[in-house]
Structures are given as structure tokens and as C-alpha cells.
Amino acid sequence: MGDWGALQTEHPSDYNFVSAQTNTGARLSLTYANTGHQRPWFKSLTVKLHGGYLSEGDTITIIFGDRSGGSPGMKLQTFCEPGFEFKVLADVCAVGHYFPLPETPHISIVPGEVHEWKAVLPSLRKIGEPFRLGL
């Protein structure tokens, strides 16, 4: 999850609000932790199903940056990544053993519109010494 903002489930009008639902109406709870799983997936969102089970064909839909409650959406990482992967693991027997699913969703993180340019220059150079200008 790079350097993006922490996910949250308490304030639907704030950035990074996450929600989840099932197609069966089963009750879910969400917990986000910065160090909730093993490396390299330290940041983790845990979805727990309460008072029931899922059968083949049932689904859980997770909405990152859910805007239905007024959230402006997600603050994503500051660098581009063509194949950002949402690693999905499942504890199908509810015993604390999580196994990765073979197919995981992914998105492309691309730059947005430029709002401000900043020149990055070296602070110490001699007269006539070449330097690089970075934007």
C-alpha cells in the first residue's frame, strides 16, 4: 500500500473510508492495521464474517474510498505503479491460517493533473559548474 493514507472505517465523510458488504446480507466487520500481517503485506484490512458462512458463489464486495457517505475517496500512493496488487488471503476454516487466493485484483496507479511545479536544484555549486534541474 505504499505511502498512501491509512484506511479507516469510522468516518464515512473522511478520506480513505472503506466499506464491505455481502450479496447475502451477512454481517461483516472491518479492521485495518499498519502491521497486521507478515512481510511484505504489513498493512492489512481484515474482513470478518459474523453469525454465518458463505457458500460457493457468495461474494464479499469491498469498496476502497467509498464515497456514498460523502468521502472524497482514497489518497493513493505518491508514485506510479502499473500493477498495484491487492493481495487477498482467506481463512476458510476460521482457524487463523490465511491462504492467498490465486486471482488477486490489481489497479494501475497513474499520475493525476499537475497542480504545482517545483524546481529541485543543488544548493552548493561553484560558478560555471554544471548541475541538473529536476521537476
Could you describe each region identified by the protein language model?
Residues 126-135:
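Beta-strand-rich structural segments
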